[in-house]
Amino acid sequence: AQDYVPGIYARIVNSAGNTNFTEAYGQVKYQLSPSLLVNLGLRAHHFGLRKEIMLENRAGLLWTLNNQHSLSFGYGKHSQPEDLNVYMIEVGGVAVNKDLKISEAHHFVLGYDWQLTDKLRFKAEGYFQYLWNIAGEEGTSYSLINLRRALYLNKKLVNNTEGRNYGIDLTLERFLADNYYYLITGSVFTSKYKAGHNVWCNTRYNKGFVLNALFGKEFYFANNRKVLDVNARVTITGGERYSPILESQSLAAKRVIFDESRAFSEQLRPLTYADLTVNYRINHRKSSSVFSFQMKNVLGAPIYIDHNYNYQTGQIELSKATLVIPNISYKIEF
């Protein structure tokens, strides 16, 4: 990996290792009454590196009020190991993270389902998640809860991070009928964490909201032998969070230095993504020909990567990429 000065390379990570991960899951379903359904589950897994068996209980309750309305409640205990290279890295020739515990979380969900018509449904879900034993660095705001890439991780970590996520999801869904369908979803949420700095603050992914709209329409020709279907999706999402940059220190050091005392207090602007898919099907006697055209990111929305120091301009810049991806395909179905 390249160090901060052009032409100078430094070894950041050089480690190797292996382990195993085994899991099993069981579920039972009880119909307590015609309107009350209970699901109970248990997941067990063994992480070879820690030689530890963990049990996770799950429960779900569905209460059907009538043909149109139902309520649901769900709980689950979840846990997962980090990427393997997190445990295998060496600092000063010592594998400093092999004793890290597995991250754990409690998930609670409360839902409401309203069948408005035989073609239209509304759903609302509220949720709360509490996370603990997440790995982070002692005395700083650094935590794997905000990690995007573990490739260059070379820090000694401890299980010092807590997190909490809560929000509400709303869905309006029209099933495919009369040759068209649509799906509209909206989410409002908050995501916070507390690491070694012992302060609750935003996670990187506390975007605040996400809106999605999906629409599809079918057109029939030639006695239904030919079908043209058009599908479009639009997503509007709040921007990712980032920590303020200490500009004078960064320019002097020729690398980005963040203000860890105000971790992830800044936010990038909201983004709008759009995808378009057009399929044209010709039904033959014993087969079908399908021509497809797909365009991802039609509006050319940028993908923000990270802040970096530009050696040519001597400035701190936000790196980004814009990918508009077309795809054309043809297939024959028998």
Model-identified regions with their sequence ranges:
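Structural signature of Gram-negative outer-membrane beta-barrels, strongest in the C-terminal barrel
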Residues: 13-132, 185, 210
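C-terminal beta-signal and adjacent terminal beta-strands/loops
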Residues: 182, 235-255, 269-275, 280-334
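Residues on the lipid-exposed face of transmembrane beta-strands in outer-membrane beta-barrel proteins
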Residues: 24-30, 59-63, 110-114, 168-174, ...
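Surface-exposed extracellular loop regions of Gram-negative outer-membrane beta-barrel proteins
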Residues: 3-4, 48-50, 68-108, 128-155, ...
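Gram-negative outer-membrane beta-barrel transporters
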Residues: 31, 38, 128-130, 152-240
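Outer membrane beta-barrel strand-and-loop segments of large Gram-negative receptors
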Residues: 12-21, 101, 121-181, 317-319, ...
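Repeated loop/turn-to-beta-strand initiation elements of outer-membrane beta-barrel proteins
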Residues: 35-38, 68-71, 119-122, 178-182, ...
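Residues that define the transmembrane beta-barrel architecture of outer-membrane proteins
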Residues: 18-22, 53-55, 104-108, 128, ...
